[in-house]
């Protein structure tokens, strides 16, 4: 039976972006070195943060619009009395 010589070198790691072809520019090296994280459409927020800070439809309708109209009409009435 044939015997192989013992391995003396450390195991090789896969080549990094620096070891790639020299024709790559900085943006290519950046895209190879940094993995893209999913969820870019969430403006950097987690799903929990987005759910907590979103505008939910109000079953009562345009409440804020009505409150603003009432406040403005009260201000006009007070201004006319003076």
Curated annotation (Swiss-Prot):
Location (main, coarse): nucleus
Nuclear localization signal (motif): residue ranges: 65-82
Induction comment from the UniProt entry of this chain: Up-regulated by stress agents, such as nutrient deprivation (at protein level). Up-regulation by gamma-irradiation is eventually followed by down-regulation. Expression increases with the tumor aggressiveness. up-regulated by DNA-damaging agent such as doxorubicin.
Biased composition (Acidic residues): 17-28
Subcellular location: Nucleus; Cytoplasm; Cytoplasm, Perinuclear region
GO biological process: acute inflammatory response; fibroblast apoptotic process; fibroblast proliferation; intrinsic apoptotic signaling pathway in response to DNA damage by p53 class mediator; male gonad development; negative regulation of apoptotic process; negative regulation of autophagosome assembly; negative regulation of autophagy
PTM comment, free text: Phosphorylated in vitro by PKA and CK. Phosphorylation promotes DNA-binding activity.
Tissues in which the UniProt entry reports expression: Widely expressed, with high levels in liver, pancreas, prostate, ovary, colon, thyroid, spinal cord, trachea and adrenal gland, moderate levels in heart, placenta, lung, skeletal muscle, kidney, testis, small intestine, stomach and lymph node, and low levels in brain, spleen, thymus and bone marrow. Not detected in peripheral blood leukocytes.
Similarity comment: family membership: Belongs to the NUPR family.
Subunit record text: Monomer. Directly interacts with MSL1 and binds MORF4L1, two components of histone acetyltransferase complex; the interaction with MORF4L1 may be mediated by MSL1. Interacts with EP300; this interaction enhances the effect of EP300 on PAX2 transcription factor activity. Interacts with PAXIP1; this interaction prevents PAXIP1 inhibition of PAX2 transcription factor activity. Interacts with COPS5; this interaction allows COPS5-dependent CDKN1B nuclear to cytoplasm translocation. Interacts with RNF2. Interacts with FOXO3; this interaction represses FOXO3 transactivation.
PANTHER family, sorted: NUCLEAR PROTEIN 1, NUCLEAR PROTEIN 1 AND 2
Stated role: Transcription regulator that converts stress signals into a program of gene expression that empowers cells with resistance to the stress induced by a change in their microenvironment. Thereby participates in the regulation of many processes namely cell-cycle, apoptosis, autophagy and DNA repair responses. Controls cell cycle progression and protects cells from genotoxic stress induced by doxorubicin through the complex formation with TP53 and EP300 that binds CDKN1A promoter leading to transcriptional induction of CDKN1A.
Protein name (record): Nuclear protein 1
Species assigned in the record: Homo sapiens (Human)
């Amino acid at each position: 039976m044939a015997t192989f010589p013992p391995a003396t070198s450390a195991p090789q790691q896969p080549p990094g972006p620096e070891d790639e072809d020299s024709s790559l520019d900085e943006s290519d090296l950046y895209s190879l070195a940094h993995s893209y994280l999913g969820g870019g459409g969430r403006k950097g927020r987690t799903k929990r943060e987005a759910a907590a800070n979103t505008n939910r439809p109000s079953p009562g309708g345009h409440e804020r619009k009505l409150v603003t109209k009432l406040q403005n009409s009260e201000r006009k009435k007070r201004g006319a009395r003076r």
